[in-house]
Amino acid sequence: VFTVTLSARDLGRGLKTTLRISWRILLGEDTLRTEDILNVIEKEGDTIAVVMFGGVQFYTGQLFDMHAITKAGHRKGCFVGFDCAHAVGNVELKLHDWGVDFACWCSYKYLNSGAGGLGGAFIHEKHKDTIKPALLGWWGHDLKTRFQMNNVMELQSGVSGFRLSNQPILLVCPLQASLEVFNMTSMQALRRKSVLLTGYLEYLIKHYYTEDPAQPHKPYIRIITPSDPQQRGCQLSLSFSIPIRRVFQELERRGVACDMREPSVLRVAPTPLYNSFSDVHRFIETLGKALASSSS
């Protein structure tokens, strides 16, 4: 939102004009329906210049149908882009094949580079000679003539022209190490394991911590992430019947690293690259102890 707001300001347009489409989640539901997204694009598309979504929604963990959204946007003449921060390294991405116009992402989530790690960007090759950067840097200059120092910019085509300067070596090293591990397998294999791993977590949560009318005082958990594996990545977003901060603190005290998001969600993401099914089982056992302590 901040980036879009800044871009709109630089173009001399107000936020109200730029972010004019508001989404409403249906009563009793926690996520957006794909058909509703496509219907809005079809209805409003003639007034929309750019459609921009998250690949995976950070709060709910919902994986959007990027291919369908891209096709719908293109039918109305819109540019379509995605923030893939929670998608890269998590789900299979075929940005080029889907015809996505542009995308960006960070590397400190599923790519394991650490907080503040390098970002990444994608521009479809069909735009390589038409989309130009607003901010120029010498690293975007053609390598063959970069050091001639003639003060005439010879911009590299595509996303390479958006580079500004040297990569910081201390940030490159952890990312390179992580990508070398990724190269030992494939996203297809990781995704297959991920579906099973998160499915196992979902099964155990529903088995042990679903609301039980016969035990009205027992804490329970509601999963707000879609149950369909095709509409989620690793992450399950959990909503609790008791104050979430206490649960988070009890888990943290027991050595479990989760993520709390206000107002009421705990994000849990068993990651196939380094988590196991036994990790998931231990988490469920620890979660039970944390719930017991939190509600006592």
For the regions a protein language model found, what residue spans apply to each?
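Pyridoxal 5′-phosphate
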Residues: 1-296
